[in-house]
Amino acid sequence: MVKKSKFWLPMIGIASAFALIPAVIVSCSRNNSTISQQYITTDIGGLNNTFNPTNTTGDNVNHKLVEKVKEIRQGGDQAKKDLLDQRVILITAGGKTNDKSFNQSVWEAVSKFSNEIGASDNTYYENSVIDQSTQSNSYDYAIAKKFKVWILTGFQQENFLIQWLSVGNNLKRFLNNKTFVITVDWFPADKSKIPAIQTILDSIKGRILGLNFKTQHGGFTMGYAASKLVQEIDADLKQDIPPNKWGTQERAFESGQTYFDAFGGGDFSGVTNFNYGFYEGLRQFNEENMNSSQQQNGKYFIKASPTDLTTNFAINNESKQKVFAQVDGHFVNGTQIPPKLIFPVAGSLTSVAIDRVKEKKSNQWIVGVDTDQSLAFEADKGILLTSVEKRIAIAAYKALLTVFGLTDYDTANQSEEKTNLLHGSGNTISDGLIMNGGSPVNFNSTGGYKEGFVGVSKSTLDPNLFKFKNKNKTYAERFDEIVAETWDKFFGKGDEEGLLQKKKNDNGGLFDENLFNQFNSATDRWSGYRNNAKTDPTKEQIDDVKPHILNLKNPFYGYMTFDDKWIYFDPIIDYINNFK
């Protein structure tokens, strides 16, 4: 039996110059870590994060919040003053804080919030090495320096934090410190089948607010919009091609059928949510633009290449060969056809895909993930169609407003309902704990397009290379227009419902989110068994997960590839079916 393990997605470290504000700055190094209070005014995350402490009248300052904080500090309510004085620390799990991506987005949120409430000593603790010892040192430092609000990025921190809490008197220290944790892109999974771990999680109930992202929304919009763009390019090219002798025209674009390709670093929802939405976008486009006979015969306008979920994020010879295979394309009737679009959900392997496209000079398009990757790949942005974004900075800023009890004072979002991440959940924050009906609870705030948690970046395709022949417009300009149209059509404009909410197709809606969430719950429980045990799941654990996954197989990834196979969560399903 092949041993499987859950691999993590390392952040892409890109050196950039921080824009510093006049403040007390402390920076030091500890072995593989850097500790700093250098606030930044960059705007990777779309927060309009510019701030001058000597001028609080700028357009991007949350004036209502600044005035409220001043009122609290001058007033007599000590409890509110104490709340404002909670110190925040960002602890990373790999990568630099100035990565022009994930970590930097979070630190932008902390910087903006800190500046607006007048906090000068909030801190980041970045770790260049991902292991238990390094992360434990981070948590020890946070306790020793009395940081009460911890922001932990990187899903691998779930296991690091639980392991640290299980050692010595760390749990007692954590509780005595009145620690509150904001988890970014992860949330502790149910560990009821592992009692020792569940006991620890029960001990810290009320102290965890998770930030997670419905990346399937962005994947859907990107997939649908890219398909429509190809359709319009084809129509544009056809204007210069006369009909054949039968009086018809074949497809002009790419000399025939077009293929899109996605690959991933692992078989868990942090990866496959992107894929799921992407394939649903392709499926929806094809269903709208093809008759039933064409669909039954697999003559889709856009087809998908097989999806490899085993690239494992790390750059090495094996993973490079897998990426090369995806970029180079698959054989159809003896002819190798490269995909027009490549969607890597595999961390640093995006750079490998970009380099391969450049080497082949193939004019293929790359789609990034997590943040606007054109900022990290400035020199190569001309082949980036877009990025499916987690709006991490916006989510983190809202989380801080929620934890500090300041959600009424976010002028950017205008309403408490849009800012308070606990709104509508029945939960409140009282004395530093999330409470529901008098009991402490941890809460996972999972947002999609409507909540401002996900998006699709502006296209940066080279305007000289990629433009329409018969109309004065670049592919990038038209793609951005289609994206806006797609959001409105499927997700709704303003308070209107979109088609995804109206559930108009036969199998319960373009997104049956309830079914989708059940599947993710099962697969993540499966992934948790593997990761926590550091070995293959037991027969009992397989039996626990198997019915959930197999029962949900048919509705998941309902999209046919060019070789007439349906895309499912094959690595898990194959493993379960072949389990001995």
Task: List where the protein language model places each region.
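Intrinsically disordered, low-complexity repeat and linker tracts
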Residues: M1-I12, L20-G75
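A residue-level marker of the well-folded mature domains of exported/periplasmic proteins
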Residues: G46, F51-P53, T57-K580
